[in-house]
Amino acid sequence: MKKLDGLYLIILAAAIVLQISLGDIPADFFAFPVNAAILAALACALAVLYREKPSLAFARWLASGRTSILMLSTLALACIILGLVTQRPEDSFAGLRNIKATWWFVDILLWLIANLIAVLLTRKFRLRFFLNHAGLALALSGMMLGSPDESSEAMAVYRADTGSGMTMTSFKAEYSPNGMPSGYEARLRIDGRDVTIKVNHPYARTVFDDVYLVDYDRSRPEPAYCIVETVHQPWKSVIWLGIVMMMLGAVLLFAQGVSTNKEKEGRI
């Protein structure tokens, strides 16, 4: 088992070297249908492995709790770096400023997804266990494999209708003592609906499209326009399905714990 732990770390190191040598993964490298094919091939390969050779050392290692901890630890470390280092789509050492597009981050997530699938294939079915692990696998798959299919478009929204389906009806900004904007919000009419959007509080235009407020006309006291960015996420439903499954799994886990405690108290 320890040798395979070492192999996992060696492959991770190789992915880091690959990142340093080649740079970020091309934006469309994992785009549909390649991402869906990779996920399906991974699931099928693991299903065959655990049906035909479940006693192999690699198969036992991949489905073990020890391996889950190892992979979650490396993912947690990557997420800490992600939170501490400002992310920009620019060249940086080992991709530290654009982690989601690095070879080594994709390597970590693919291994973790494989581990979750392996655990599901080798454990006795329990609904709460299935919901938690399958939900996490779906959420990770949607976030990682679905990111190449994401697209965004920024545009200026004026008070007059320009044929985009969006017009600005009012704008409000708050300023700090040094004169810099501390927050702002725009009242927009989108597809016939009056909505208010703020920074980091997008409007869900469709199931797959979110409209973000990113900037505004700073050349005059009363802005003539604001700038919004529409982000299209085709895999958003997969991510939300995974999140909902994990929430249901957590509720069942809590309910099971309460039921178990009551049974113990009844025996005393």
Language model features with spans:
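Solvent-exposed, non-transmembrane regions of integral membrane proteins
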Residues: 1-268
